[in-house]
Amino acid sequence: MKVFEAKTLLSEATDRAKEYKELRTQMVNLRKALKGVADLSDSEFSGKGASNIKAFYHDHVGVADQWIDYIDMKIAFFNSIAGAAEDKGLSDAYIEESFLEHELANANKKSKSIMSEQKKAMKDILNDIDDILPLDLFSTETFKDELADANDKRKKTLEKLDALDEDLKTEYALSEPNEQFIKSDFQKLQEATGKGKNATPIHYNAKAYRESDIHKKKGDIEKRTEAYLKIKKEEAKEREIEKLKERLKNYDYADADEFYEMAKTIGYENLTAEQQRYFTQIENTRELEAGFKGVAVGLYDSGKDAVVGLWDMVTDPGGTVEAITGAMAHPIKTYEAISAAIEESYQKDMVNGDTYSRARWVSYAVGTVVTSIVGTKGVGAVSKTGTAAKVTTKVKTAASKSATAQKAITVSKQTVDHIKQKVNTGIEVSKKHVKTKLNQIGDLTLADILPYHPRHDLVPAGVPYNAVNGVTLKEGLQKFAKVILPKPYGTSSSGRRTPAPHVPPVTVKYGEHFARWSRKKVLKPNIIYKTKEGYTYTTDNYGRITSVKADLQLGEAKRNQYAQTNAGKPQDRKPDDDGGHLIATQFKGSGQFDNIVPMNSQINRSGGKWYEMEQEWAKALSKKPPKKVAVQIEPVYSGDSLRPSYFDVTYKIGSRKEISVSIKNQPGG
């Protein structure tokens, strides 16, 4: 009979993991020493038998690698025991199986029997006095319910104990093939060294060892090990995320840095709306602080007529960062979104608002148009086009009875100079002021972060709402929004496209996911788009594909030779690269740039890891009936390169266990 004591088990697991870590350090040092001999140059070590000796040590390095992988599996296993026990609700339990199966089970039966006998005895008593004092017999329903719950808990505890025991034993056994392989493989290495007196490294036969049937299984063992370690890593991350999510439920947001780190670990998509808003505020503040000095100096050097307020930097990254970097910086800044938000605010504040909201809406709207969205276009541009003068004249005429209003909306030379002065002053504004502004954001809506949102220290105020044509003003805002949207992406010093700020991606229609940069078709940054087959793609702030999710379909799609030939050019494509399809055309994958990345030809073509993986998928889809093949592909990049360094792929065929592989973007994968 089993006895489960969580405290002892977890303590032993921690100790064993520590011992394996120490062993790993020793094995790494041994590997380093072996490799030191194997890598000796001919000038350092040559002569009769030198090549055999170096090959002998080189193959020992491979054996050491196998031991390190085996040790990593053991460490991952022992580190996961605490989480496995917690998943079953047994992290602090003490359980004697015999007590649950016998004593407690018997107690349950005995309790039922006792209650039944007592109820029968009471019934007899009540029957005897029924003619004198009729009484109802007490109900045993509550007792039965409580007893049933207790018995159910007993059974479930036994089930959890058995399941945990079986899971841990099964998982522990997963490393046994590695251990058996290492022993058998090492035996072959010894045999290749010679026999009897000739058993020395100088007689080592590397070819015999490397071509042995046992050694050829090395690749399969490595794949299994890699898959296991990846699963354990993901399990640990998921458990950490769940703990942090639980912690954030009642978090008081007092420590912004702590919250930010927890939220980054959890992932933006796993946060609540309130947490997402707070996370974005913190992230924008950090980006602003990091680039504060450079942005201010850059603005000063480029001319004092480029008016950009610091508050714009936080609330309107789509407008102000575009003016600085020349990039389409914020994904929600599309004409449809802006126009809809303008319409929404107009209906809310003008049509259905009160006196205050109408006056406020008109004041801010006029101020926005008068200054051509101060911080996005710049007062200098307004002065040159005469837009300010035209709008001012119209409103002055409409509000001729109000001298106060006329004075408030006049954009004079003094006003322009005042705004320019604010830019110079803004350069000196402290980070503390910016943080204070962020803390005042409160509950944001889409309207709050769009370009026409009020700039309290820049827009005119006091305009009488009843003297302005609100519909015309609304349409003017919408037209202006449309004008400022199309802006080219900038070019970095490395010749690549400049990135947009890091913001949550938004979904766009397929066909609207492309943009133009240097007369080339490129993907928009920070977006999610879906093909007609239902394949979903996500881009990062560089416009690179970072995720593809698909339930594959068998079929043929058109290839685009130009897209395949030019993927990653000119900076990032290597001579032996192909234009590799993330979702192959045999699965109806797009032949355009929205599905192609620079991919090493050896992994992409026949015999390569990527090719073989696709063949496995195609085979499953070709069966009758076809099996479901669900895949997720995540290209991982270094720096601002458009060429993935490697691909993390997770796929599931039918009811089989999910498989995770990592394929390096290099020969051999």
From Swiss-Prot:
- Which stretches does UniProt call biased (Basic and acidic residues)? 570-580
Region of interest (Disordered), ranges: 561-580
GO CC terms on record? membrane raft; plasma membrane
Q: What residues does the LXG domain cover?
A: 1-235
- What is the first-listed, main subcellular location in coarse terms? membrane
Which keywords, in A-to-Z order, does the entry hold? Answer: Cell membrane, Coiled coil, DNA-binding, Hydrolase, Membrane, Nuclease, Toxin
Query: What's a Gene Ontology MF term here?
Result: nuclease activity
Database matches in InterPro entries: Bact_secretion_toxin, DNA/RNA_non-sp_Endonuclease_sf, Endonuclea_NS_2, LXG_dom
What turns on this gene? Expressed on rich and minimal solid media likely in early stationary phase; dependent on DegSU. Not expressed in liquid LB, but only under conditions that promote biofilm formation.
Q: What phenotype has been reported when the gene encoding this protein is knocked out?
A: Deletion of the yeeF-yezG operon has no visible growth phenotype, however it is out-competed by wild-type cells.
Entries under PROSITE patterns matching the protein: LXG
**The family this protein is said to belong to:** In the N-terminal section; belongs to the LXG family.
Q: How does it assemble?
A: Interacts with cognate immunity protein YezG but not with non-cognate immunity protein YobK. The interaction probably inhibits the toxic activity of YeeF.
PANTHER family linked: RIBONUCLEASE YQCG-RELATED (PTHR34976), TYPE VII SECRETION SYSTEM PROTEIN ESSD (PTHR34976:SF2)
Would you tell me the protein name for this molecule?
A: Toxin YeeF
